[in-house]
Amino acid sequence: MKILVIGSGGREHALCHSIQKSKDCENLYCVPGSDAISLIAECHPIDTKNKQRILNFCKEYNISFVVIGPEIPLTEGLVDILISNNIKCFGPSQKGAMLEKSKIFTKELCNENNVPTGKYKKFSNYEDALIYCQSINFPSVIKADGLAAGKGVIITENLKEAK
């Protein structure tokens, strides 16, 4: 099986490291990859936002299976495009990736479907959020909506930290 891993970070390096051990892995490619990944997979410097170029690569190299590491290609619908072209993928559809992309979407979906979740308030401007923070007990958790590369959550111990 010819396998393509999308990404260039530690997560993708770990994926490549594990995948290349499989007896089912005939060829392993990574886009764009990194110096470390190039030691275990054939890397190609394709922008992960360029869905058409990735699709063309898959067709040219007869890729059987794609594993997508980073959130952005998932939220931009790469899985949907590849699957619609009969290329198997590991990763959620664009709609499914909304659970990762938007904390507000996920909280509202949980509430609509009676899935237990923590209390929350959403704000579209700093001033309203600050007024609310003046009325709550600490510690409290503040989360940015949208992708934040794993850095969108802050646990605050007091109002000064919340600001």
Task: Annotate each PLM feature.
Residues 1-94:
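ATP-binding N-terminal substructure of ATP-dependent carboxylate-amine bond-forming enzymes
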Residues 4-5, 99-163:
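Active-site nucleotide/adenylate-binding loops and adjacent lid/helix of ATP-dependent enzymes
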